[in-house]
């Protein structure tokens, strides 16, 4: 109940924005719109002005100029997200839904709007001749291919400007300049430390901006691959597999293994099985990384998929333990079939909800010899 989500319009000097729940803050109340967004201009002694109503809970507001703004809403139970184009000038134009999707469906993610800094030092959506621009991570069933897309705000027509074609490297687009048709991008591979480049999309010419060296050369030649496998109910799973330093793949010596994972809840099996791992990502150890164990003779399965799915009215946690054990068994089976792991010497590790996962796996299965619940 009441006003919430107070913020400032980034395209104006002093305009306050806030949200009011139209269902009294109770999701059980059935209403056509859950939230309404208002604005109040300085000196804040006038009547607030309604900007739009949203079907779900407002999650984000993005501003371009006096006549163009974007709102995003979400509803957790259905995982639905709507992206609205609206006119914040008080023209009375009805907000238009330009994207309506499952926010866990990474394959349909339209990306984020390209922004620049305005006279107030705030980031606003770039508009060029009635077009906005989107930068997407570009996950597909065939791999990750980041993209730039032009969106005509009048017709909603989308035009692909650029799609990454790298197959041996990972590309991450950091920024796009529509006027110059240039991107700032980062390139990396398992052994190539990430560096930044400026690229003209018309000519394709790359200009390297940074020249960082790999500080982790002791593990740069460690074998790394993204493996894909299935759970016993057919859901697609994946994980990033590392073999120990100096391991001879031809010998198929069975080694101890540690699995790092974090359970994720889904409402349908198709999104649960989507792959968001890129085999070309640089191997970057940090203080909590499991990758260090490759220097101690361990096989490491990092970021192993652990989906917990609840379809329809079923909640994911209704079958939490069964699905947890199914995920773990599928991961061990997959690496065992490759000939690398001693099944009697497998450990599992996780942080927070992942630590809860570890406790349940050690309590309700006999798959693991040890666990780290961080």
Task: Kindly label every feature range from the protein language model.
Residues 31-45, 83-92, 147-156, 198-201:
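Beta-propeller blade signature
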Residues 31, 62, 72, 174-374:
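Serine-hydrolase catalytic core recognition
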Residues 25, 110, 141, 192, ...:
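Short glycine-rich, flexible loops that bind phosphorylated cofactors or substrates
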Residues 44-47, 57, 79, 91-94, ...:
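Short acidic/polar mixed-charge low-complexity motifs
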Residues 143-148, 347-349:
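Long, heptad-repeat coiled-coil alpha-helices that serve as cytosolic signaling/dimerization stalks
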Residues 1-19, 23-26, 35, 46-88, ...:
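Conserved beta-propeller blade repeats
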Residues 46, 78-80, 143-145, 193, ...:
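Short secondary-structure junction motifs
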């Amino acid at each position: 109940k009441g006003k919430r989500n107070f913020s400032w319009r980034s395209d104006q000097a002093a305009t306050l924005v806030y949200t009011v729940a139209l269902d009294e803050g109770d999701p059980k109340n059935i209403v056509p719109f859950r939230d309404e967004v208002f604005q109040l201009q300085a000196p804040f002694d006038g009547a607030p002005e309604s900007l739009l109503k949203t079907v779900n809970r407002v999650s984000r507001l993005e501003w371009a100029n006096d006549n163009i703004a974007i709102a995003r809403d979400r509803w957790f139970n259905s995982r639905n997200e709507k992206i609205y184009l609206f006119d914040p000038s008080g023209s009375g134009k009805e907000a238009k839904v330009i994207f309506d999707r499952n926010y866990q469906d990474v394959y349909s993610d339209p990306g984020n709007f390209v922004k620049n800094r305005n006279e107030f030092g705030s980031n606003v959506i770039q508009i060029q001749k009635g077009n906005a621009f989107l930068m997407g991570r570009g996950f597909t069933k065939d791999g990750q291919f980041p993209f730039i897309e032009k969106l005509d705000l009048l017709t909603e027509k989308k035009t692909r400007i650029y799609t990454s074609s790298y197959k041996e490297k990972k590309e991450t687009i950091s920024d796009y300049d529509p006027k110059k048709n240039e991107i700032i991008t980062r390139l990396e591979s398992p052994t190539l430390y990430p560096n930044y480049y400026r690229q003209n999309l018309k000519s394709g010419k790359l200009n390297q901006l940074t020249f960082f060296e790999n500080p982790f050369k002791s593990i740069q030649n460690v074998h790394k691959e993204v493996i894909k496998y299935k759970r016993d109910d057919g859901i697609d799973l994946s994980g990033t597999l590392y073999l120990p330093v100096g391991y001879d793949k031809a010998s198929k010596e069975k080694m101890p293994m540690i699995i790092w994972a974090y359970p994720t809840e889904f409402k349908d099996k198709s999104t649960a099985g989507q792959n968001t791992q890129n085999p070309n990502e640089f191997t970057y150890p940090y203080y909590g990384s499991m990758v260090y164990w490759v220097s101690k003779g361990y096989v490491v399965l990092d970021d192993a998929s652990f989906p917990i799915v609840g379809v329809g009215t079923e909640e994911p946690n209704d079958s939490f333990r069964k699905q947890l054990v199914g995920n773990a068994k599928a991961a061990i089976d997959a690496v065992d079939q490759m000939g690398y792991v001693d099944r009697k010497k497998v450990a599992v590790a996780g942080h927070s909800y992942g630590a809860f996962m570890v406790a349940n796996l050690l309590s309700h299965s006999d798959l693991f010899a040890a666990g780290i619940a961080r």
